Swiss-Prot record:
Description of how the protein assembles with itself and partners: Homotetramer.
Catalyzed reaction equations: L-tryptophan + H2O = indole + pyruvate + NH4(+)
Organism of derivation: Aeromonas salmonicida (strain A449)
Modified residues (N6-(pyridoxal phosphate)lysine): K261
E.C. numbers: 4.1.99.1
The protein's name in its UniProt record: Tryptophanase
Taxonomic lineage of the native organism: Bacteria, Pseudomonadati, Pseudomonadota, Gammaproteobacteria, Aeromonadales
Pathway: Amino-acid degradation; L-tryptophan degradation via pyruvate pathway; indole and pyruvate from L-tryptophan: step 1/1
């Protein structure tokens, strides 16, 4: 079959520059062996995150020029609200500056409404900031991911699913009154950008509602999840992405969204409620205090204009096929070279199994982070660790939590890089593989108490 190229023309370019090996080592040492602390100008191909790093369309840039910067009642908010109601069916819409802004104003209110004395949040897998906001609210985050996701070589289609048996047992053991919310993360980032099946979402929603537990959808990559449902579930093969999205969101009571992913914008988030006017109003109070007035939530009007357009563009099936195909292509290149990855590839990134590639480095020396550093030194490619460093310590004991995965995430920004860039990344990682046994683990030089992977400084063991 003829290969289909990117479904867009490029109207603007940004120069990037290569660096020497000596320059990269100096930059990494200055950054405390933490790719997060590298200067962007020292990075050749940046696969740190897909959050806010994508390219906007000409229509979005046109929307930027039509920004209404009224403090209250901006017409851009009205358009965003109309778009959310149409696409997701949620009546009460609150913009936030990004996803974590939505979490910080919602989670404390869910805790306040929890009838039990020991509230917990249960998810297929909380991402780092989600877990942090649960802990900042004084509560515990419990991950109940399907065990099928733990075998990175198994070609299971729905590695983002909940373990339904454990979910049932956990609710019964802890008591439904102690569950502040069940959070369905779509797609499941920490498991490898893996999708959650519609059947699993339906079962989780039914179980939660039977116990009167709120269902929150962490919707950062909702469109990619919908694409996988269409591609992998025969029952939805003839459904449109829009129809699948609407059915997914029918299963939640509220959603938080970092719109910097599938919203195709550089900044923005959403905190939305299907009904729940009383909860919505309580969260509004926090929004005013922490994010900004309820019709802008920390965003400029022009950013809301771009988001209203981006939500629709992000659901375009042709775009999604290209997007997920680009991820799959990089995964195929690596797998063909014998580099272990989470299979099948997910929606936004290729996840390299550092535990298998670097078996000589124990979890407490952060093998995936060590691999990220080695990849940067090889070719100026910046990736990020999803493993023990990100997971952190048990807040009760202070001991390092045991990570299910030690993964290097190669996160592909939307509409930014071409296949040639992917080939370069693959070539660099293949070169790293040839000297994998020489890579050393890392230990802390400075360890922050929370979300340590962002600002920690490390050194080779």
């Amino acid at each position: 079959m003829r290969r289909i190229p990117e479904p867009f023309r490029i109207k603007m370019v940004e120069p990037i520059k290569q660096t020497t090996g000596a320059e990269r080592r100096a930059a990494l040492e200055a950054a405390g062996w933490n790719p997060f602390l590298l200067l962007a100008e020292d990075v050749y191909i940046d696969l740190l995150t897909d959050s806010g790093t994508g390219a906007m369309s000409d229509r979005q840039w046109a929307g930027i020029m039509m920004g209404d910067e009224a403090y209250a009642g901006s017409r851009n908010f009205v358009e965003l609200e109309r778009t959310v109601r149409e696409l997701f069916g949620y009546q009460h819409v609150m913009p936030t500056h990004q996803g974590r802004g939505a979490e910080q104003i919602l989670f404390p209110e869910l805790v306040k409404r929890c009838k039990g004395k020991a509230p917990v949040f249960i998810s297929n897998y909380h991402f780092d900031t989600t877990k942090a906001h649960v802990e900042l609210a004084g509560e515990r985050a419990i991950n109940l991911l399907t065990p099928k996701a733990l075998d990175t070589t198994a070609p299971y289609a729905w590695k983002g699913d909940f373990d339904l048996g454990r979910l049932t047992d956990t609710i019964e053991t802890l008591g439904a009154d102690n569950v502040a919310a069940v959070i369905i993360t779509v797609t499941c980032n920490s498991a490898g950008g893996q999708p959650v099946s519609m059947g699993n979402m339906q079962a989780v929603s039914e179980l939660a509602r039977r116990h009167h537990i709120p269902v929150v959808i962490d919707a950062a990559r909702f469109a990619e999840n919908a694409w996988f449902i269409k591609a992998r579930d025969p029952d939805y093969a003839k459904s449109s992405i829009k129809e699948i999205v609407r059915q997914m969101f029918d299963l939640g009571d509220m959603f938080t969204m970092s719109a910097k992913k599938d919203g195709l914008v550089n900044i923005g988030g959403l905190c939305c409620f299907k009904e729940g006017l009383d909860l919505f109003r309580s969260v509004q109070v926090r929004c005013v205090a922490m994010e900004g007035f309820v019709t802008y939530g920390g965003l400029a009007g022009r950013d809301m204009a771009a988001l209203a357009i981006g939500l629709r563009e992000g659901m375009d099936e042709e775009y999604l096929t290209y997007r997920i195909g680009q991820v799959a292509y990089l995964g195929e290149r690596l797998a063909e070279a014998g580099i272990p990855i989470q299979t099948p590839t997910g929606g936004h990134a290729v996840f390299v199994d550092a535990k298998k590639l670097l078996p000589h480095i124990p979890g407490e020396q952060f093998p995936a982070h060590a691999l990220a550093c080695a990849l940067y030194l090889e070719g100026g490619v910046r990736g990020v660790e999803i493993g023990s460093l990100l997971l952190g310590r048990d807040p009760a004991t202070g001991k390092q939590e045991a990570a299910d995965f030690e993964l290097l995430r190669l996160t592909i920004p939307r509409r930014v890089y071409t296949r040639d860039h992917m080939d370069y990344v693959a070539d660099c990682l293949i070169a790293v593989k040839t000297r994998a046994s020489e890579i050393r683990g890392l230990t802390f030089d400075y360890e922050p108490p929370l979300l340590r992977h962002f600002t920690a400084r490390l050194k080779p063991v």
